[in-house]
Structures are given as C-alpha cells and as structure tokens.
C-alpha cells in the first residue's frame, strides 16, 4: 500500500521551471569519433551513439559539457565505457553523421542531434522526434540531476509495443498507452519494450519513469467541470451508508482516497474519519463536462468492489481487490466538448481501511505517446536493439543484461502458493493432500509471516508455529516436492539484522524517524535497506544464506 506518494521513495524533489537553455553552455558544432561510436554536439545537448554489436546501439544525451562516468545496474560491465571493440563505419553526409554496422545504421543530425535508425536494407525502423528530448533540472537531497524525456515518431499505426514488466491493469499492447514504472506489491516494472516493427528499447534508468504521457494523472476537477447530483457546479456528491444504514453525505471536489495518513494506518487521506467502512456502501455521483472533444484516459485506484458508469454506460464492470492491497485499472471514454454527462462510482470498501480513486488524462495530440520520461537521471540513456523477430530482440536484451538461466524441470511444474501458511502442519498437510489426490505439485511457497510477528527481517521461522523447520523441509522433499520461501528487504528495528545494516549506514530510516508503523498486529517500526549499495547487497545475501540455506531452502522475492 502507499503511505503517501511515490515521490517519498526518492526524497523531496525540486523542479526547475525551465528547460536547460542552449545559452547555458557553449559547444563547438560537429562530431567526434570514438573507439566505439561518435559524439555529436548539438545546440542543446551532446548526443553520443555507441555501437555494442552489429544489432545493438546505445544512445546517450546530456546538457552538460561532459558525459558522466558509465555506471549501470542492469547492463553488463563489458558493454559500459569503451571496452567494447565492435565493427562499424562512420560517414559524414550533408549535415548528418552515419554510424553503420552490417545490420543497422544510425543517422545523427548534426544540427539538432536527432537520431534515426535503419536496417541494413535502408528501411526506417525508429526515428526520434526533432527537438524530442528535454532536460529539466532537479535537485534531490542536494544531488543535482535532470528530469528527462525522449520521444519518437510513431511510424506505423499498426505497430504493437509489448513489455514494461508485469502490471495489473489488463493492458498488453502499450502502443498509445501509458504506464508508470515503479515497484509495488504485484507490480513489476522493467524499462524495456519490444516492437512488432523489429526493434526493442531498453531505457537505462532506476528512477520513477513513465511510458507514454510524462505527466501524472489529473484530478477530475482539473480537467472537467464537476457538478453534484443536484446540478450545482464544483463537486460530486458522496453518499456514505454504513452497515447499519446510517447515511452521511459530503460534497467531494476530487475522488482521491489513495494514501494513508502518515503515521496513521487506520485512516486514508481525504476520507471521512467518523465513519465505519467495513460493510459499508459508498456512491460518488454527479456530472462531468469536458472542455475539449477527444479520448479521455482514466485510471481508477480501488480495493474492495468498485463499478463505474459514465454517460449512463457501465464503463468498468465490478472489480474486486483485497481491501489492504489496492490496485489500478485503466479505461478510456470519448467525450464531447461542452456536453455534460452523468458519472457514478459505486464502491463497497470491503474492509475498515480501503482505497478509492479516479483520475484522468485529457486528450493528447497524435504522436505524443511514443515517449519515455524519467523523474531523476544524469542523462538520457537508452539502447536500440534490432532483431528479425521478437525472439531475436529478446536475445539482444539478454546480451546486454546477462543470460537467462535455464530452469530445472520441476520449476516448470505446478507451484502451490497462498497468502501465508500459519503453521508447519498447514504446509505439510497441503503437500500431503496433493499427493493423496494424485494432483501433481512440484513446489510449495511459504510466504510471509513464517517468522515471529515482531521479527520481520530475522529470517527465522517462528519456533512455536514452525518447530523443526529442517524436519519440515526434509518431509516435503521426501514427498518429492520443493520448498520456496519469500524474503523481503524489510527489517524491524528490533532485529539483529536491522542493527547490522544500521551500524554500516545501510538503512533507509525515514519511516523510523517519522515513527511510521506498519499494519502487522499493533504496528511495528521498520524500514528497508539500501539495495543500491553493493556491500549492503552482499550482507543481505549472507544473512539469508546463514539462516535459510542450512534448511535447503530456495529464496524468492515478491513479486515473483
């Protein structure tokens, strides 16, 4: 669940109000030949194109005088810096510089730094928009960087774009779609896309990123005129009916009940506090009036049951999500400027703490959706991968990021997983029952809270509920099944592991300083370790090995 908003994960960000002006630095026009590519100096940025192999090129751009030293968490070290020794040619032609291999060619415009990609037959594959990159200065905790954006022309209206990880909004083709990239329970973000037009893009960034629209979704009242159910302008009408039939009515300027109050796990920001949501029914209704005609893209945030109607039509059939773990769902509606249409949101919270939200993107111009935005980066940095088909493109991705290990046969079988097992007997009984019924099973996942309630991060089984964990694992192995345990980079302050990280300065301590307790039992203080520190990662791994490996357990993290 979200405690406040995503920006808290990155610290307080201060945005510069203007794009970096060309007058801020003086650069000599032209290009420089590198061992593995070229650097072109354009009026607003230096653009570097490096050849990785005959099918992969790396494009970097910076408004600074020099590029920052290479450092990547996802690309193999041998492809960083200029250690690579690829075969390519460089040709200067009429204001452009061409970098060509046996399979692809990049053409860089010397005037504006625009990059175009072609295959070996001269077919245009991908084209950056002219003036399609922006750098907006930002500062985070005293560290300077840029909010960056890169856009490309959409050459083929029938193109399909797939990837971006594992998201939960029921979208697969991301052409003309929007997706926010961050890590969240059941949401896995991977900044890589594959196109049906024979290319892939790896966006090398670890900040909050957005594919498509670079802006955050707007509140309804920022895009539409709102009217309550009586027709009065300014709000929607919220009607709250508790399980006993007691009714409360409020005027709602926005439907944005998505974040817990800091330090208060019992209440959601903006929702009425003096109301019992368990077993209740809530309705938000009224009218919206758009100022322009076009396709409006909505995002709903929900837990419990939620249904949405616009202009008398059910645009979102009833969706459910467990109350404590909300999800997002996206839909779009064509609306006409000046036409007021009814809107109704039906919500059953299904818990004492639940979430509801509805925000929107106004229509965007054609060609603005093939875009990548990063909240805080040193530079624009992406890899273009050519392939004869999707499998070939994925092979290029693996070339850059490392080979995918071949899984053992049992890993292709059925995995039994549930929210949690409460006792050793539950685990053994489950596997035993599968065997009795001759239902194939290869792996059982022991998820969270196998530790003592107050010991998250101890990597120890609760001895009362899971006596003799080694014997439990051996028994499962004797039934010809495997065991997997979920682990987290989260530690309660009372655990020895937290203290070990803290002594080295490897804990994010904002939640501890702010006394933010989690939702387990009475609520406990804890936080996460700094996984960007290589020594901290080694410690995390060693702690798991010390406690889990003697039990012959395999480790996973969530989401899987």
Provide a role label for each language-model segment.
Residues 551-560:
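Residue-level detector of conserved catalytic or cofactor/ligand-binding positions
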Residues 305-315:
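Short, surface-exposed beta-strand/strand-loop-strand elements in extracellular ectodomains
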Residues 383-386, 411-424, 454-467, 520-543:
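The substrate-binding groove and active-site-proximal loops of carbohydrate-active enzymes
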Residues 27-31, 35, 50-97, 135-138:
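A low-complexity, Ser/Thr/Gly/Pro-enriched, surface-exposed linker/loop concept
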Residues 221-265:
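Predominantly extracellular/luminal regions of secreted and cell-surface proteins
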Residues 426-449:
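Catalytic domains of carbohydrate-active enzymes, especially glycoside hydrolases
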Residues 489-551:
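Active-site-adjacent "subsite" loops/lids of carbohydrate-active enzymes
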Residues 92-231, 245, 296-300, 310, ...:
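Catalytic and substrate-binding clefts that recognize carbohydrates or anionic sugar/phosphate headgroups
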